[in-house]
Amino acid sequence: AICVNAAINKQDAVIHLAAIIPMLSETNPSLAEKVNVQGTQIVIDAIAAQPKMPLLVFPSSISVHGFSNNRVPPCRIDEPLHAQDNYASHKIECEKRLRASNIPWVILRIGACVDALNVKAGDQEAMLRHMFTLDVDTRIEYLHPHDAAIAMSNALDNPAVIGKTLFLGSGKSSQTSWLEFVNIMPRTMGLGDLPVSAFGHEPYYTDWMDTAESQQLLNFQQLGLDGYKRELAQKWRFLRILLWPFRGLIRHRMLKFSAQKA
Protein backbone atom coordinates (compact mmCIF):
# COMPACT_ATOMS: atom_id res chain seq x y z
CA ALA A 1 0.00 0.00 0.00
CA ILE A 2 2.89 2.36 0.77
CA CYS A 3 4.34 1.84 -2.71
CA VAL A 4 0.94 2.44 -4.31
CA ASN A 5 0.45 5.64 -2.32
CA ALA A 6 3.85 6.89 -3.44
CA ALA A 7 3.17 6.01 -7.08
CA ILE A 8 -0.20 7.78 -7.11
CA ASN A 9 0.94 10.89 -5.24
CA LYS A 10 0.36 14.05 -7.31
CA GLN A 11 -0.70 12.14 -10.44
CA ASP A 12 -3.43 13.44 -12.75
CA ALA A 13 -4.74 9.99 -13.70
CA VAL A 14 -4.20 6.30 -12.98
CA ILE A 15 -4.67 3.33 -15.34
CA HIS A 16 -5.02 0.20 -13.19
CA LEU A 17 -4.03 -2.73 -15.42
CA ALA A 18 -2.76 -5.16 -12.76
CA ALA A 19 -4.92 -8.30 -12.65
CA ILE A 20 -4.83 -12.08 -12.60
CA ILE A 21 -6.87 -13.44 -15.49
CA PRO A 22 -8.09 -16.92 -16.49
CA MET A 23 -6.87 -19.57 -16.31
CA LEU A 24 -4.83 -18.70 -13.18
CA SER A 25 -7.77 -16.83 -11.65
CA GLU A 26 -9.71 -20.10 -11.67
CA THR A 27 -6.95 -22.40 -10.41
CA ASN A 28 -5.71 -20.01 -7.70
CA PRO A 29 -8.78 -18.02 -6.62
CA SER A 30 -7.26 -16.85 -3.33
CA LEU A 31 -4.30 -15.19 -5.03
CA ALA A 32 -6.56 -13.78 -7.74
CA GLU A 33 -8.90 -12.22 -5.18
CA LYS A 34 -5.99 -10.58 -3.38
CA VAL A 35 -4.65 -9.06 -6.59
CA ASN A 36 -7.90 -8.31 -8.38
CA VAL A 37 -10.15 -7.12 -5.56
CA GLN A 38 -7.94 -6.21 -2.62
CA GLY A 39 -5.36 -4.67 -4.94
CA THR A 40 -8.01 -2.50 -6.57
CA GLN A 41 -9.26 -1.38 -3.16
CA ILE A 42 -5.73 -0.28 -2.26
CA VAL A 43 -5.65 1.82 -5.44
CA ILE A 44 -9.08 3.33 -4.65
CA ASP A 45 -7.99 4.21 -1.10
CA ALA A 46 -4.74 5.76 -2.33
CA ILE A 47 -6.60 7.93 -4.84
CA ALA A 48 -9.19 8.97 -2.23
CA ALA A 49 -6.38 10.13 0.06
CA GLN A 50 -5.06 12.62 -2.50
CA PRO A 51 -5.93 16.32 -2.07
CA LYS A 52 -6.71 16.41 -5.79
CA MET A 53 -8.03 12.97 -6.68
CA PRO A 54 -6.78 11.61 -10.03
CA LEU A 55 -9.08 9.86 -12.48
CA LEU A 56 -9.00 6.06 -12.25
CA VAL A 57 -9.27 4.28 -15.60
CA PHE A 58 -10.37 0.77 -14.67
CA PRO A 59 -10.34 -2.06 -17.24
CA SER A 60 -13.21 -4.46 -16.56
CA SER A 61 -14.47 -7.20 -18.88
CA ILE A 62 -17.34 -8.29 -21.13
CA SER A 63 -17.30 -11.42 -18.96
CA VAL A 64 -19.33 -9.64 -16.25
CA HIS A 65 -22.45 -10.08 -18.41
CA GLY A 66 -22.26 -13.87 -18.33
CA PHE A 67 -22.96 -16.40 -21.06
CA SER A 68 -24.00 -14.92 -24.39
CA ASN A 69 -25.84 -17.87 -25.95
CA ASN A 70 -29.33 -16.66 -24.96
CA ARG A 71 -28.67 -12.96 -25.59
CA VAL A 72 -29.63 -10.97 -28.69
CA PRO A 73 -26.53 -9.18 -30.00
CA PRO A 74 -25.00 -6.75 -29.61
CA CYS A 75 -24.59 -6.76 -25.84
CA ARG A 76 -25.52 -3.41 -24.30
CA ILE A 77 -23.69 -1.85 -21.38
CA ASP A 78 -26.85 -1.78 -19.23
CA GLU A 79 -27.60 -5.50 -19.52
CA PRO A 80 -27.65 -7.59 -16.30
CA LEU A 81 -24.45 -8.88 -14.72
CA HIS A 82 -23.99 -12.63 -14.24
CA ALA A 83 -20.59 -13.84 -13.03
CA GLN A 84 -19.72 -17.29 -14.41
CA ASP A 85 -16.22 -17.57 -12.92
CA ASN A 86 -13.90 -16.02 -10.34
CA TYR A 87 -12.50 -13.48 -12.77
CA ALA A 88 -15.91 -12.07 -13.66
CA SER A 89 -17.01 -11.98 -10.02
CA HIS A 90 -13.85 -10.06 -9.14
CA LYS A 91 -14.54 -7.50 -11.86
CA ILE A 92 -18.14 -7.08 -10.70
CA GLU A 93 -16.99 -6.53 -7.13
CA CYS A 94 -14.40 -3.96 -8.24
CA GLU A 95 -17.00 -2.09 -10.29
CA LYS A 96 -19.28 -2.07 -7.24
CA ARG A 97 -16.53 -0.64 -5.04
CA LEU A 98 -15.71 2.05 -7.58
CA ARG A 99 -19.32 3.20 -7.74
CA ALA A 100 -19.50 3.28 -3.94
CA SER A 101 -16.37 5.43 -3.70
CA ASN A 102 -16.06 9.18 -4.08
CA ILE A 103 -13.19 9.10 -6.57
CA PRO A 104 -13.48 9.98 -10.29
CA TRP A 105 -13.52 6.85 -12.45
CA VAL A 106 -14.30 5.36 -15.82
CA ILE A 107 -14.94 1.64 -16.28
CA LEU A 108 -13.94 0.05 -19.60
CA ARG A 109 -15.37 -3.42 -20.21
CA ILE A 110 -12.94 -5.11 -22.57
CA GLY A 111 -13.52 -7.78 -25.22
CA ALA A 112 -11.09 -10.50 -26.34
CA CYS A 113 -7.71 -8.76 -26.26
CA VAL A 114 -4.54 -10.50 -27.46
CA ASP A 115 -1.87 -9.75 -30.06
CA ALA A 116 1.14 -11.43 -31.67
CA LEU A 117 3.25 -10.60 -28.60
CA ASN A 118 1.09 -12.13 -25.87
CA VAL A 119 -0.82 -14.85 -27.71
CA LYS A 120 1.37 -17.56 -26.11
CA ALA A 121 1.08 -16.27 -22.54
CA GLY A 122 -0.30 -18.46 -19.77
CA ASP A 123 -0.91 -22.19 -19.36
CA GLN A 124 -1.05 -23.39 -22.95
CA GLU A 125 -2.38 -26.87 -22.22
CA ALA A 126 -5.20 -25.59 -20.00
CA MET A 127 -6.13 -22.96 -22.58
CA LEU A 128 -6.20 -25.51 -25.41
CA ARG A 129 -8.44 -27.86 -23.43
CA HIS A 130 -10.78 -25.00 -22.62
CA MET A 131 -10.74 -23.74 -26.21
CA PHE A 132 -12.07 -27.05 -27.51
CA THR A 133 -14.96 -27.17 -25.01
CA LEU A 134 -16.66 -24.07 -26.44
CA ASP A 135 -19.41 -23.88 -29.03
CA VAL A 136 -18.10 -22.88 -32.46
CA ASP A 137 -20.90 -20.34 -32.94
CA THR A 138 -20.09 -18.39 -29.79
CA ARG A 139 -19.92 -14.70 -30.65
CA ILE A 140 -16.68 -12.89 -29.95
CA GLU A 141 -15.55 -9.32 -30.55
CA TYR A 142 -11.83 -8.81 -30.77
CA LEU A 143 -10.07 -5.80 -29.25
CA HIS A 144 -6.57 -5.08 -30.51
CA PRO A 145 -4.24 -4.10 -27.63
CA HIS A 146 -3.24 -1.03 -29.66
CA ASP A 147 -6.88 0.03 -29.79
CA ALA A 148 -7.23 -0.62 -26.05
CA ALA A 149 -4.19 1.55 -25.35
CA ILE A 150 -5.55 4.38 -27.50
CA ALA A 151 -8.90 4.23 -25.69
CA MET A 152 -7.31 4.36 -22.25
CA SER A 153 -4.97 7.14 -23.28
CA ASN A 154 -7.81 9.20 -24.73
CA ALA A 155 -9.83 8.68 -21.55
CA LEU A 156 -7.18 10.39 -19.43
CA ASP A 157 -8.01 13.94 -20.47
CA ASN A 158 -11.67 13.58 -21.48
CA PRO A 159 -13.99 14.80 -18.69
CA ALA A 160 -17.00 13.43 -20.61
CA VAL A 161 -16.07 9.84 -19.69
CA ILE A 162 -15.98 10.36 -15.91
CA GLY A 163 -18.56 8.15 -14.19
CA LYS A 164 -19.29 6.18 -17.38
CA THR A 165 -19.10 2.46 -18.07
CA LEU A 166 -18.12 1.72 -21.66
CA PHE A 167 -17.43 -1.29 -23.86
CA LEU A 168 -14.08 -1.62 -25.62
CA GLY A 169 -14.15 -3.71 -28.79
CA SER A 170 -12.58 -3.00 -32.16
CA GLY A 171 -15.95 -2.65 -33.90
CA LYS A 172 -18.19 -4.53 -36.30
CA SER A 173 -15.31 -5.58 -38.56
CA SER A 174 -13.81 -7.38 -35.53
CA GLN A 175 -16.97 -9.31 -34.67
CA THR A 176 -16.65 -12.99 -35.50
CA SER A 177 -17.38 -16.50 -34.25
CA TRP A 178 -15.33 -18.62 -31.87
CA LEU A 179 -14.41 -21.04 -34.67
CA GLU A 180 -13.22 -18.28 -36.99
CA PHE A 181 -11.24 -16.59 -34.22
CA VAL A 182 -9.55 -19.77 -33.02
CA ASN A 183 -8.62 -20.78 -36.58
CA ILE A 184 -6.68 -17.57 -37.22
CA MET A 185 -3.57 -19.03 -35.58
CA PRO A 186 -3.38 -22.49 -37.21
CA ARG A 187 -4.39 -21.00 -40.55
CA THR A 188 -1.59 -18.42 -40.35
CA MET A 189 0.93 -21.08 -39.35
CA GLY A 190 0.00 -23.19 -42.38
CA LEU A 191 -1.67 -25.90 -40.30
CA GLY A 192 -5.13 -25.49 -41.81
CA ASP A 193 -8.43 -24.98 -40.02
CA LEU A 194 -9.37 -27.05 -36.99
CA PRO A 195 -12.45 -29.23 -37.60
CA VAL A 196 -15.82 -28.26 -36.16
CA SER A 197 -16.10 -31.76 -34.72
CA ALA A 198 -13.18 -31.05 -32.35
CA PHE A 199 -15.24 -28.50 -30.43
CA GLY A 200 -17.85 -28.95 -27.75
CA HIS A 201 -21.05 -27.04 -27.05
CA GLU A 202 -20.27 -25.09 -23.88
CA PRO A 203 -21.42 -21.44 -23.78
CA TYR A 204 -18.98 -18.62 -23.09
CA TYR A 205 -19.15 -15.03 -21.95
CA THR A 206 -17.69 -13.30 -24.99
CA ASP A 207 -20.10 -11.44 -27.27
CA TRP A 208 -20.45 -8.71 -29.85
CA MET A 209 -20.75 -5.33 -28.16
CA ASP A 210 -22.44 -2.00 -28.74
CA THR A 211 -19.40 0.28 -28.90
CA ALA A 212 -21.06 3.32 -30.50
CA GLU A 213 -20.75 5.51 -27.40
CA SER A 214 -17.22 4.45 -26.53
CA GLN A 215 -16.01 5.02 -30.09
CA GLN A 216 -17.62 8.46 -30.15
CA LEU A 217 -15.96 9.45 -26.88
CA LEU A 218 -12.58 7.72 -27.25
CA ASN A 219 -12.02 7.32 -31.02
CA PHE A 220 -9.92 4.18 -30.63
CA GLN A 221 -10.97 1.62 -33.26
CA GLN A 222 -7.95 1.50 -35.57
CA LEU A 223 -6.21 -1.87 -36.04
CA GLY A 224 -8.82 -4.43 -35.02
CA LEU A 225 -8.94 -8.04 -36.14
CA ASP A 226 -7.35 -7.33 -39.52
CA GLY A 227 -4.37 -5.79 -37.74
CA TYR A 228 -4.02 -8.88 -35.56
CA LYS A 229 -4.02 -11.13 -38.63
CA ARG A 230 -1.36 -8.99 -40.32
CA GLU A 231 0.84 -9.10 -37.23
CA LEU A 232 0.62 -12.89 -36.96
CA ALA A 233 1.41 -13.31 -40.66
CA GLN A 234 4.47 -11.08 -40.28
CA LYS A 235 5.66 -12.78 -37.09
CA TRP A 236 5.31 -16.32 -38.40
CA ARG A 237 6.27 -15.85 -42.04
CA PHE A 238 9.51 -17.85 -41.66
CA LEU A 239 8.21 -20.23 -38.99
CA ARG A 240 5.41 -21.22 -41.36
CA ILE A 241 7.99 -22.54 -43.84
CA LEU A 242 9.86 -24.47 -41.15
CA LEU A 243 6.67 -26.01 -39.77
CA TRP A 244 5.31 -27.14 -43.12
CA PRO A 245 6.88 -30.66 -43.05
CA PHE A 246 5.53 -31.21 -39.53
CA ARG A 247 2.07 -29.72 -39.96
CA GLY A 248 0.29 -33.07 -39.66
CA LEU A 249 2.08 -33.93 -36.42
CA ILE A 250 1.40 -30.49 -34.94
CA ARG A 251 -2.31 -30.67 -35.84
CA HIS A 252 -2.51 -34.11 -34.27
CA ARG A 253 -0.91 -32.85 -31.05
CA MET A 254 -3.27 -29.87 -30.89
CA LEU A 255 -6.33 -32.04 -31.41
CA LYS A 256 -5.25 -34.34 -28.56
CA PHE A 257 -6.46 -31.60 -26.21
CA SER A 258 -9.99 -31.95 -27.56
CA ALA A 259 -12.38 -34.12 -25.56
CA GLN A 260 -14.47 -34.57 -28.72
CA LYS A 261 -13.96 -37.09 -31.50
CA ALA A 262 -12.54 -34.83 -34.23
What is each residue range found by the language model?
Residues I20, Q41-N86, V106:
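Conserved Rossmann-fold NAD(P)-dependent oxidoreductase catalytic core, especially the SDR/UDP-sugar
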Residues Q84, G111-N118, L134-H146, S170-S174:
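Glycine-rich "substrate-gating" loop/helix at the edge of Rossmann-like oxidoreductase active sites
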Residues K34, N69-L108, T133-L134:
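Catalytic helix-loop patch of NAD(P)-dependent Rossmann-fold dehydrogenases
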Residues H65, D85-N86, V106-Q124:
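Flexible, glycine-rich beta-alpha linker
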Residues A1-V35:
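NAD(P)H-binding glycine-rich loop region in Rossmannoid oxidoreductase-like domains
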Residues G122, F132-L156, K164:
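Substrate-positioning beta->alpha
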Residues S101, D115-E125, A155-L166:
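Glycine/proline-rich active-site loop of Rossmann-fold NAD(P)-dependent oxidoreductases
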Residues A151-L217, G227-E231, W236-L239, L243-R247, ...:
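Mid/C-terminal beta-alpha module of Rossmann-like enzyme folds, strongest
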